[in-house]
Amino acid sequence: MREYFKHTSSLLFGVIISIPLAIYYEISMLLANRGMEAEVRNAADVLFKRIFEGIGYDGPLAGVVMFALLFVIAAIAQGAHKEKTGIKIHWHYYPVLIAESALYAMLLFALMAISMNAMTPTLALSPIDIGYSLGAGVYEELLFRALLLSGLLFIAGKLPGKTTVWKIVAVLISALLFAGAHYIGAAGDTFSWMSFLTRSLGGLLLGFVFMFRGLGAAVYTHAIYDIYTIFL
């Protein structure tokens, strides 16, 4: 069990198991946006795509280049610490991690439902709905946890005082920014303190999942939670 937790929390494992979700998301968005003047996409995805468009890669190619770059970075990082995790990918851990993430997602769903006092489910779950949920899991976790929270945790480790306290502050900051991002732009939600606090609570849980269980668990927890909110 110790080997399972150590292996599945690695960045390389997280990047690799996020790729199938990203592929499904890209295909579903291509189908959903056929013939539309304004594309519907996850905001975090749009942000990443614009960055890569600036260096000459656009559309799905930008996603391919981004994940190739992530894979190289993760492989180098894991190779430098191979005495801890090893380079080999143990695929039999994949379904176990999905089941583990589903449990975290159910906990998140329960907490969010209690906070919101009620949930409004959508009874019809389409392949495109699933794709959008998977994309949110991948791109929002890459932005707010893999990049933002990792950066904040790095800074927290350099600050004077108790590192644990600073790490909790880092998770809180990333959670607040994650919640606030849902109200930005034309497609953003209407702000209310209840929804903001609820999303902040969700960001806290996802932050701790990322910190203790790695990118893969955070991505799948987020994606499965989004599917729960549509289906349950």
Model-derived segments and their meaning:
Residues S126-L232:
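Transmembrane helix-loop-helix hairpins at the membrane interface
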Residues I19-E26, V64-G79, A105-L111, L176-L177:
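Hydrophobic core of alpha-helical transmembrane segments in multi-pass integral membrane proteins
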Residues R2-I19, I89-A102:
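Alpha-helical transmembrane segments and their helix-start/interface "positive-inside/aromatic belt" motifs
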Residues S18-V40, M112-N117:
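Alpha-helical transmembrane segments of multi-pass membrane proteins
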Residues E37-I55, A118-G131, T190-M194:
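Membrane-interface interhelical loops and short amphipathic "cap" helices
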Residues F48-L70:
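Interfacial helix-start motif at the membrane-water boundary
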Residues Q78-G137, L153-G161:
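Juxtamembrane helix-loop-helix connectors linking adjacent transmembrane helices
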Residues L30, A113-T122, A181-A187:
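Juxtamembrane "helix-exit" motif on the non-cytosolic side of transmembrane helices
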